[in-house]
Curated annotation (Swiss-Prot):
This is Histidinol-phosphate aminotransferase. The keyword Nucleotide-binding does not apply. HAMAP family: HisC_aminotrans_2 (MF_01023). The keyword Cytoplasm does not apply. The gene is hisC.
Length: 359
């Protein structure tokens, strides 16, 4: 029998896909909890009624109501907005549009969101890392030293999982360093919790700036899978060349348009205020908990904390049905767990469980 007939299906796959370690999403990690504080979701559901029932027809590639509503909300032109299946698809689209596999590289600054790396590896694009400084700000010299051959630089602000904003002057320096050389992607998935820090006002000045947004966090629609890419029209037109022909289903577009109407935006801002209040409650309580070494400042809907024995704490709470996010494997985050801000009842369960931990 020939070797060709004995190859497994896996042998037929691309080598980089065979070697790929997929992104460990909260759902992929599993668990049997009833307090889910590991995915930075809003803790309660928002109800919507479908108004579009014409499901026998394909949807628009870029639903007009969604684009126009988001443009008005974000303070940009409709031509500067692209909607996709979550911001994760936006990450992939930028890499596919701007990076030649085997030639170009992306650059990111760990500890940060894992999908930048996974998306590049899936496509076969080199990944370069310039670890953040001790205060988790950008190592601008390190980035500058690695720009040759880099086509896309990813920066998350506020950063996931650390929760802090990137210094705006450093972002401006980065944009000057990369002008004419690379695209800079600012991931603003959590910007609703600190809207004053958005870079949307910089799009005119920096044609190579791309901003990622989502409805998964403050809009409480993680299950909808709806994200946005904001950029200059030239960039948006390039991304439209590589996006799928029907990225958003009719029900998704229907609900997204409703969420982005004035009433929906006001409701989102109420949720943000509620989350910020609960975040402060949780921070204060964690600082008075014996097994907690340090609580890091956060501008988001989650808190990063360092524990005296994070692995045993994580497992203990897991066994009690309280699911947190272990960050031990991230660079510089040894001993750290990330806790999504939940309801007052959920937050109290976390505190009660932590205070029962042996020290």
């Amino acid at each position: 029998m020939s070797t060709e007939n004995t190859l497994s299906v896996a042998d037929l796959a691309r080598e980089n896909v065979r070697n790929l370690v997929p992104y460990q999403s909260a759902r992929r990690l599993g668990g049997n909890g009833d307090v889910w504080l590991n995915a930075n979701e809003f803790p309660t559901a928002v109800e919507f009624q479908l108004t579009q029932q014409t499901l026998n027809r394909y949807p628009e590639c870029q639903p007009k109501a969604v684009i126009e509503n988001y443009a008005q909300y974000a303070g940009v032109k409709p031509e500067q907005v692209l909607v996709s299946r979550g911001a994760d698809e936006g990450i992939e689209l930028v890499i596919r549009a701007f990076c030649e596999p085997g030639k170009d590289a992306i650059l990111y600054c760990p500890p940060t969101y894992g999908m930048y790396s996974v998306s590049a590896e899936t496509i076969g694009v080199e990944r370069r890392t310039v670890p953040a400084l001790e205060n988790w700000q950008l190592d601008l010299q390190g980035i500058s030293d690695n720009l040759d051959g880099t086509k896309v630089v990813f920066v998350c602000s506020p950063n996931n999982p650390t929760g802090q904003l990137i210094n705006p002057q450093d972002l401006r320096t980065l944009l000057e360093l990369t002008r004419g050389k690379a695209i800079v992607v600012a991931d603003e998935a959590y910007i609703e919790f600190c809207p004053q820090a958005t870079l949307t006002g910089w799009l005119v000045e920096y044609p190579h700036l791309v901003i990622l947004r989502t409805l998964s966090k403050a809009f409480a629609l993680a299950g909808l899978r709806c994200g946005f890419t904001l950029a200059n029209e030239e960039v948006i037109n390039l991304l439209l060349k590589v996006i799928a022909p029907y990225p958003l289903s009719t029900p998704v577009a229907d609900i997204a348009a409703q969420a982005l109407c004035p009433q929906g935006i006001n409701a989102m801002r109420d949720r943000v205020a509620q989350t910020v209040q609960e975040r402060q409650y949780l921070v204060n309580a964690l600082k008075q908990t014996a097994c907690v070494e340090h609580v890091f400042d956060s501008e988001t809907n989650y808190i990063l904390a360092r524990f005296t024995a994070s692995s045993s704490v994580f497992k203990s709470l897991w066994d009690q049905g309280i699911i947190l996010r272990d960050q031990n494997k991230q660079p510089s985050l040894s001993g750290c767990l990330r806790i999504t801000v939940g309801t007052r009842q959920e937050n109290q369960r976390v505190i009660d469980a932590l205070r029962a931990e042996p020290v």
